[in-house]
């Protein structure tokens, strides 16, 4: 995967209100569930959940990420990309970012997460405030080659704690939709 993620044409991240009448209920439920995705995936996989880190490091953030975090375009930040897996299959591609300047003074050490879920950390720390979820058709060029499909739904939200902002994006891969469908049978 290119680790300077390419910029894409303007991506429209939309709130629930703009998608509520155009998407089916199961898709909306996954995109706009405000609970812990890690916990939901753990339940769906019957505790066969794991995190596979793909990339962690400093790089220029994408323009849409800078805008969401209130940073100058092209500002450098910490980027963490992982697969959230169920039964060893990639179910979700997740990309979490934070600006360098706020992360260095924010008291959160993302470099030591390894195979632990960032979501679990965010939901266990009551000081984090989650801002509203937004969803879009995630650009194929932003995905790892192995899972790059056109038209996949992704969501993102900003988590804030005492001036520290993290942006977490999660893209729902075909294997997740299949597992969710089988679970409802």
Curated annotation (Swiss-Prot):
Reactions accelerated catalytically: chorismate = 4-hydroxybenzoate + pyruvate
Entry's localization field: Cytoplasm
Superkingdom: Bacteria
A Gene Ontology molecular function term of the record: chorismate lyase activity
Gene Ontology BP annotations: pyruvate biosynthetic process; ubiquinone biosynthetic process
Enzyme class name: lyase
Binding-site positions, substrate: 80, 118, 170
Entry similarity comment: Belongs to the UbiC family.
Protein name: Probable chorismate pyruvate-lyase 2
Provenance organism: Pseudomonas entomophila (strain L48)
Species lineage: Bacteria, Pseudomonadati, Pseudomonadota, Gammaproteobacteria, Pseudomonadales
């Amino acid at each position: 995967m290119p680790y300077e993620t390419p910029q894409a044409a303007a991506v429209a991240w939309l709130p629930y209100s703009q998608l509520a009448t155009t998407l089916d209920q199961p898709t909306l439920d996954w995109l706009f569930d405000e609970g812990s995705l890690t916990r939901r995936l753990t339940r769906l996989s019957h505790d066969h959940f794991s995190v596979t880190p793909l990339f962690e490091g400093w790089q220029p953030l994408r323009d849409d990420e800078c805008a969401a975090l209130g940073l100058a375009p092209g500002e450098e930040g910490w980027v963490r990309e992982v697969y959230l897996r169920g039964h060893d299959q990639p179910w979700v591609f997740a990309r979490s970012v934070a600006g360098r300047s706020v992360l260095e003074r924010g008291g959160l050490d993302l470099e030591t997460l390894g195979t632990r879920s960032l979501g679990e950390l965010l939901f266990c720390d009551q000081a984090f405030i989650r801002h509203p979820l937004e969803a879009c058709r995630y650009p194929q060029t932003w995905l790892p080659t192995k899972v790059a499909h056109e038209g996949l739904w992704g969501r993102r939200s900003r988590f804030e704690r005492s001036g520290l902002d993290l942006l977490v994006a999660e893209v729902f891969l075909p294997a997740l939709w299949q597992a969710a469908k089988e679970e409802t049978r």
